[in-house]
Amino acid sequence: MTSAGQVVLRHDWRGGWQEGISELSIPTRDAFLAAPLLERYTPMSFRDLLLLMEEYPDICIITDTKFTDAEVVTAQFTAMLNDAHELGLSYLFDRMVIQVYSPLMFRVVDHLGHFPHYIYTFYAEGFNGTEEALRERLTFCRKNGIEGVTMWSWLWRPSYAVIAENSGVRCYVHTVNDRETAEALLQSGISAVYTHYLGLHED
């Protein structure tokens, strides 16, 4: 979020990515958009993303917000909803998967307006790897319309596949950047893997 509470597309405010911008110097939206990322990439705001999604109807995204505090989550998603409303593009939330990191975050976000697609990612809250813990989280997802869960690839066990299938909730893992590992995970019951490489599935 910018200094004025507007949502832009950046992982965090660490220094060195954009001139004059750091955790100690959080920019306005205009200042952010005026400073190339790593001296070569074009910065984008959430509004820019919406306009891009309108132009290209095959784009779908997973949100990757970095806050779990209820007040900040509320401010962030309210700003996103307001941007979409002002542009007349609220329907584009149908092509977004809202990533949540805990049951509390889900309830905070869902209170603002139920989104069509959610995914529950475990890394922020932690996951002890037991089958019982997985069942509890998948039960929460099923009861609340959350379509999938994501965990670190090294936490996945083939024994989870039956649990996931019985719950009707899909399981995903991150981050996998080699084909053999990805194929093995998919064969063991994972629905999909997160990767940095678009061509991971190609021959």
For the regions a language model picked out, list residue spans one by one:
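Metal-dependent phosphodiesterase/phospholipase catalytic core, i.e.
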Residues: S3-Q6, H11-H117, E147, M151
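C-terminal active-site rim and adjoining tail of enzyme catalytic domains
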Residues: Y120-D203
